[in-house]
Amino acid sequence: SKVNGVIAIDAEGSVDVKSCTFSDYTDVEDEYESALASGPMLLMEGKVCSFPQDAIYTQRMARSVIGITAQGKMMLLTIDGAITGNADGATLEEAAFIAKTLGMKNAVCLADGSSSTLWTSGKGVVNHPVGNGQYDHEGEGTVSTVIYVAASSLFDGGDGTVDNPYLISNRNHMRNMMSVVELDKTYYFEMTNDVDMTGIDWKPLNTGE
């Protein structure tokens, strides 16, 4: 399939999904700590990309997708396929439509067929990989590369009280403010660093005089 995208991770651990060709790799290397080239791109700035009409693009099959919302949130999507009557899969256009419906702004296709597997530490394989032809969780194929997502601290420190405010040093911490704020409660935050929020859509937490 066409490799025209990249999943890139910066020094703060923020993930970006963007269009990228071979000539752009040097710029990506300079800007990010880690990157994985993949493709094809499904969504760019909320718009469905155009695809060739080759069978690999128009055929319904299992798909794996990673995307970023307008707020910078990463989303992982696996579409089961090739199991008639249980999972028919998706064409690339259909996968792009699903990704957009879920709220992704930029999205790229990772893998198809039995390589499309989603695993969690609590439940193991949660989708139905097609490698064994059965609608179960045992048909995952062998792959050389995985994307591993681990939980990190919401902030650099603090507990949100006036004497021990949450410490914010990067844009991930800024986004995490929404995770802790509850109605009719007071929270305290302290900026410990200048934070570049370029390209991140803002959502107000509250309004006041």
Whereabouts are the PLM-identified features?
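Gly/Ser/Thr/Pro-rich low-complexity, intrinsically disordered segments
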Residues: 1-152
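Surface-exposed repetitive/solenoidal architectures
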Residues: 153-209
